[in-house]
Amino acid sequence: MKQDVIVIGGGIIGCAIAYSLQKRGKRVVLLEKNNLVGGASGSCDQGILLQSKAPGEHLLLGICSMKMYETLGRELGADLEFQQKGYMLLMESQAECDAMDGIIRQQRALGLPVERIEMDEALRRQPGISREAVVGATFCPWDSEVNPYKTTLAYADAAVRLGAEIRIHTPVTGLILQGGSLCGVRTPEGEIRADTVVLACGAWTPEIGAMAGLNIPIRPRKGQAYISEAVSPFIRCNLLNARYIVAKHHPELLSDDRSLAAKLGVGFCITQSAKGNVMFGASREFAGYENTNTPDGLREILSNAVRLMPGIRSLNIIRTMSGLRPYSPDSKPLIGFVRDVPGLFLAAGHEGDGVSLAPATGKMAADLILQGKTDVPAAASFNPNRFPLTGKAA
């Protein structure tokens, strides 16, 4: 039977879109070449960060998504381990403080309740931060966390209950084009026809897009991290270092840093799961599709983490992990129909924001596919046609 929509990709973005379409009456089949949550959605922390979003449309989309998370667990009928306990960003120099002051002013103007706090307050919220390495912090009470595994699977389960079909271990081997329009896909089990095909394959989206002659400007950006054994409460307030934000918004301040850590894009983030496992990292590396942990990466991440929070030395590490984030040139996802290939819809390029932006992305995609418009804030700025998709990749 012909489907209304084929969604390619079984991460949090693909599952959110499949659910959002199915609940509004579309017949949906989701195809995943491996297992659900097998890509970046299964290799990330649980942060729903708003402080990390650039002031403007990216932040507005993040706020929209965070508000949807507040009721999403009830809607899906699952415990997503959602908590809104805030995040702190740690600053290590006066230059970072000055840069963050400017970013904070712009974020507050858009309604985000973020503020600068002194070190005494930072240490009250999270003991163990190094006074020698950290000179100040910011705090935002809206920053939250959620279990990405449980959330992705809850989206998938809810979609199936509503009638969607999910096929794992089903790679797409080709796209079916008629008169320049996309009307289906080929798999090892045969062809599937549909009015719309959604590419939500994260870092692998360009591989599928190439089957339609597209050069989608998304690149894999590897992140490495550590996982500890479960311990009693160690992290009261999730942390991220401001260097990551400064690198996104003011890279010129870091242009003279020739260290290996800078080359690997090493930053600091730390969270603790509901079961007690501590996760910390991470790197941001352009290494193609090579997705393994490396001695250099792990060494630099650990050195940086211990410098900022010496108590990490007491943790027993049980494993390391790595994942490939889908990077886009302007740090914003590509969400919308492709002008030159009717029937093809992109929802990828979220990089490290897939978990944060999944609910809003699901709604935006469903709105645009069903009615050609959406009330999700600043949706037009994520239109994939801002890039020359049929020309040379950016």
Where does each model-flagged region fall?
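Glycine-rich FAD pyrophosphate-binding loop
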Residues: 22-42
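Short hydrophobic core segments
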Residues: 6-8, 185, 192-204, 362
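C-terminal lid/capping helical subdomain adjacent to the catalytic/cofactor pocket in oxidative enzymes
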Residues: 3, 16, 24, 334, ...
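Beta1/beta-strand and adjacent pyrophosphate-binding region of the FAD-binding site
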Residues: 1-11, 29
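Short beta-strand to alpha-helix junction loop
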Residues: 60, 90-99, 139-157, 292-297, ...
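Dinucleotide-binding Rossmann-like beta1-alpha1 core, especially the glycine-rich loop
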Residues: 46-125
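Helical element adjacent to the flavin cofactor pocket in flavoenzyme catalytic cores
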Residues: 138-195
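Active-site substrate-recognition segment that forms the wall
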Residues: 19-20, 48-49, 80-82, 174, ...
